[in-house]
């Protein structure tokens, strides 16, 4: 069983976004850093990623990656009951290209973490 300190450290390494929120962040050691709430149309600076969450046909996430690196990542849906589901996610393409994910589950938050550089172009 995870201790509260280890659990808090694991959660601190992820970014949680609620429906209606948009965030800009950078990646360091595979985890989101320097995250800040922004307007949905905010333009990511070089090296930044914009994450937006919406309630549309369940839960929808869009990400715009303004870095030269393509990533895979883990997306975890948090339900109203606090239970989590690790969701299938596709690659996050580089060079200011948009990625969109949609899941049928309604989530109160989406956590993203474990970003890994990849050369893949397909979903996992």
Task: Identify the function of each model-found stretch.
Residues 57-61:
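Structural beta-strand segments of beta-rich domains
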Residues 110-124:
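Short, low-complexity, Pro/Ser/Thr/Gly-rich segments in the mature regions of secreted, periplasmic
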Residues 71-76:
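Short, hydrophobic/aromatic beta-strand segments
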């Amino acid at each position: 069983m995870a201790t509260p300190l280890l659990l808090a450290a694991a959660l601190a390494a992820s970014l949680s976004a609620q429906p209606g929120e948009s965030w800009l962040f950078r990646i360091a050691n595979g985890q989101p850093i320097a995250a800040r709430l922004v307007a949905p149309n905010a333009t990511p600076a070089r090296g930044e990623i914009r994450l937006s969450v919406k309630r549309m046909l369940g839960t929808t996430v869009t990400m715009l990656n303004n870095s030269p690196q393509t990533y895979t990542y883990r997306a975890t849906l948090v339900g109203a009951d606090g239970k989590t589901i690790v969701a299938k996610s596709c690659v996050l393409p580089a060079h200011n290209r948009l990625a969109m994910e949609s899941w049928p589950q309604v989530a109160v938050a989406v956590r993203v973490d474990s970003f890994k550089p990849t050369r893949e172009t397909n979903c996992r």
